[in-house]
Amino acid sequence: MRHCGWLLGLLSLFSLATHASDWQEIKNEAKGQTVWFNAWGGDTAINRYLDWVSGEMKTHYAINLKIVRLADAADAVKRIQTEAAAGRKTGGSVDLLWVNGENFRTLKEANLLQTGWAETLPNWRYVDTQLPVREDFSVPTQGAESPWGGAQLTFIARRDVTPQPPQTPQALLEFAKANPGTVTYPRPPDFTGTAFLEQLLIMLTPDPAALKEAPDDATFARVTAPLWQYLDVLHPYLWREGKDFPPSPARMDALLKAGTLRLSLTFNPAHAQQKIASGDLPASSYSFGFREGMIGNVHFVTIPANANASAAAKVVANFLLSPDAQLRKADPAVWGDPSVLDPQKLPDGQRESLQSRMPQDLPPVLAEPHAGWVNALEQEWLHRYGTH
């Protein structure tokens, strides 16, 4: 047995040495490469953070990180699909992509992503694997994307205006009736607007188990009927009587600050802190959620199969997982995006820093529906309410 243990230990050391050697080869190959990182560019705090990442990659890794700021990640997905259709198997225009679950599913099912690389990154050892880092919208990731940050649908209110917020869908409806014109949500297919529909669906449907699989027509009609009944009652009491909707959460923030709205929505539980720090929301702003829970997920970066700078893209993804990068990202004065690292896996000083930057008193996290529900919900919403 002693010899067995010795042999296993030797094999483990050999494996670690091999892995370190492989990673050094990747870093060597990455030097001088240019990475085109396609990411949503709709938030100045995120843009500033990515500019900092760019500088770090140049200084410490000799990698040229170019940020392509997107209005919608679907634009990059279409480019990847077009390149694949044209037979462009190498030299693709996208090296790294900040992706949501719906777009991940689209690319993965078409075999347009590299797989099996995420858990080989050296900084994976710090990841909190209790988070849903191995599936995305109920789709197994299979190492095809690396976690970057946590997220949870979150309401924002002002304590001087709304000291007691609604904590159930029914309470939200009563709140809207009592305060007509001061409640709304972003127009789907805005990501946060669609997440709001998913949140209501989870809480209103009599068959939440059906949300774990992609719907067929009959299932969709049956499961979503309570959602449309709820919205039909809610909409007349919304901002502009539900005949128009803000295009984005940023517009809702501005309307909340102006006093037009009583509630805003975000998919970042630290968003209110960050916007208070930047002066974009009043100091009385606070976050809250429904008592039973709010949907949450992990957001990821992925590498297309035809990426031109695959090695450098992996080095960037690994840096994004580093304690220094995650701590900076979690700082509300910088971005305020929740970390995907486990504080217990970090050295003492970093552990305490990360714990101090983790949002407190959050409601339970509810799992998102299967990615197959997203487009179906958006199309039905547009059919019912999008032509006003």
UniProtKB/Swiss-Prot annotation:
Q: Matching InterPro entries, A to Z?
A: SBP, YnjB
Q: What GO biological process term is on the record, naming one?
A: transmembrane transport
The record's region (Disordered) falls at 333-357
**Superkingdom of the source?**
Bacteria
Q: GO CC terms on record? A: ATP-binding cassette (ABC) transporter complex, substrate-binding subunit-containing; membrane; outer membrane-bounded periplasmic space
PANTHER family to which the protein is assigned, alphabetical: PROTEIN YNJB
What is the name attached to this protein's record? Protein YnjB
Q: What is the lineage of its organism?
A: Bacteria, Pseudomonadati, Pseudomonadota, Gammaproteobacteria, Enterobacterales
